[in-house]
């Protein structure tokens, strides 16, 4: 490992290894055996990181638990665990780590649940290693990498930063509670030498509003977790903020494509119905269909240069009068209006057309806008059947903790 180099949460790699061995010893002492599921109900920070790597040393399967869940949801996720960890793990250091195989499950990772009930996905040590190597090949790797993580560690986008950084022997900074001003300040601070940060679109928008410009050491903002409005990318470009739009999902151990290009070693194809299909060493074997591909449920296409474009979700397509409408396309047009801060497009039953297109819109502070103005804005940029039949002005939109729109709460 990296010895005295900082690993995460102020711990050097030597200190992290010592803490992980103590955590592994505590797990073994409490009867955890290789392959046993261990629920990690810990706040993000050094104790969580030590417990995670302790699970790996003991050959156990780590299951990160979201502490914000209700009692019933937590019980459902913890019921198969042989141990629920709620306090720091400290025991006699485990001297001999369990010999692991690439096909051994490392983490039971729950999906975000934005479009369906959250479900556990088994991700192996081989999945994590393949993902880390492919990501480094796509984005490059700075020996002095410092990766800021404001994403929840209970989701794959956040946890992947911890695991990749350990594989690279580089530094991760865990930011347990996202605050736009604090993130903007950290990225602007040359002394912190932050080279990478992972954000979702709503986070980036807030960081830019907080005044981030020309961060001195930043190589990339890895931006994913939902549709990325072109207007947001333009704002980032004007501010001198380097953005790598990223497409991924839990079943693929986070990244599938970055800046439109599939990661090295990852195969992507478009099915006849425009669904994106994926396979590769980063994909959970349990997520593969009988045809050997991960059917993502996302819709997409390749542009003239061979770059992957995401056009929407199969389950979210609105069928109005026999025409298909992708909500993300309409949202992107709405967000081009200077008075619009956020937008969500969804469907409502329509006796004549089957479904009608409806938009919920959040205006920027101090802005005013009539429904007719916004519909006229869309009419000049979209086919008539895609223009929202109704526009509702709201104060906020329902989003998951990773920034994904929860459309079902509006429709």
Task: Identify the role of each PLM range.
Residues 10-14, 106-133:
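Conserved AMP-binding A3 loop
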Residues 3-6, 92-110, 117, 126, ...:
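Conserved pre-ATP/AMP-binding loop-to-beta segment of ANL
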Residues 194-199, 203-259, 267-269:
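Gly/Ser/Thr-rich phosphate-binding loop
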Residues 242, 261-265, 269-296, 301, ...:
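Conserved ATP/PPi-binding loop(s) of AMP-dependent carboxylate-activating enzymes
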Residues 280, 299-386, 396-398, 403, ...:
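AMP-binding/adenylate-forming catalytic core of the ANL superfamily
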Residues 4-32, 36-39, 43-45, 72-74, ...:
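Conserved AMP-binding/adenylate-forming core of the ANL superfamily
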């Amino acid at each position: 490992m990296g010895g005295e180099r900082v690993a995460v949460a102020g711990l050097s790699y030597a200190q992290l290894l010592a803490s992980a061995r103590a955590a592994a010893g505590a797990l073994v002492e409490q009867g955890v055996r290789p392959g046993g599921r261990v629920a990690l109900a810990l706040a993000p920070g050094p104790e969580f990181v030590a417990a995670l790597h302790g699970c790996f040393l003991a050959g156990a399967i780590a299951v990160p638990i979201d502490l914000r869940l209700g009692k019933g949801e937590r019980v459902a996720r913890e019921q198969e665990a042989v141990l629920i960890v709620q306090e720091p793990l400290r025991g006699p250091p485990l001297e001999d780590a369990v010999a692991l195989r690439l096909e051994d499950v490392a983490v039971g990772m729950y999906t975000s649940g934005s479009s369906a009930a959250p479900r556990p996905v088994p991700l192996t040590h081989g999945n994590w290693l393949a993902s880390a190597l492919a990501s480094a090949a796509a984005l490059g790797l700075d020996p002095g990498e410092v990766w800021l993580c404001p994403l929840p560690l209970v989701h794959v986008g956040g946890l992947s930063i911890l695991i990749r950084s350990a594989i690279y022997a580089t530094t991760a900074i865990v930011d347990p509670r996202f605050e736009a001003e604090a993130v903007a300040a950290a990225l602007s601070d040359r002394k912190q030498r932050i080279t990478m940060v992972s954000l979702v679109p709503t986070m980036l928008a807030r960081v830019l509003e907080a005044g981030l410009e020309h961060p001195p050491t930043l190589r990339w903002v890895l931006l994913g977790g939902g549709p990325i409005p072109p207007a947001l990318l333009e704002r980032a470009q004007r501010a001198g903020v380097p953005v790598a739009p990223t497409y991924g999902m839990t079943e693929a151990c986070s990244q599938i494509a970055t800046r439109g290009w599939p990661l090295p070693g990852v195969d992507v194809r478009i099915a006849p119905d425009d669904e994106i299909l994926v396979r590769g060493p980063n994909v959970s074997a349990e997520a593969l269909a009988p045809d050997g591909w991960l059917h993502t449920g996302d819709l997409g296409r390749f542009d003239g240069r061979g770059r992957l474009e995401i056009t929407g979700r199969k389950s979210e397509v609105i069928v109005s009068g026999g025409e298909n409408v992708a909500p993300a396309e309409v949202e992107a047009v709405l967000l081009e209006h200077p008075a619009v801060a956020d937008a969500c497009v969804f469907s409502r039953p329509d006796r004549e057309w089957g479904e009608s297109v409806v938009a919920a819109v959040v205006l920027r502070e101090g802005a005013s806008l009539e429904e007719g103005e916004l519909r006229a804005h869309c009419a000049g940029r979209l086919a008539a059947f895609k223009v929202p039949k109704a526009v509702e002005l709201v104060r906020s939109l329902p989003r998951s903790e990773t920034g994904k729109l929860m459309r079902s709460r509006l429709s």
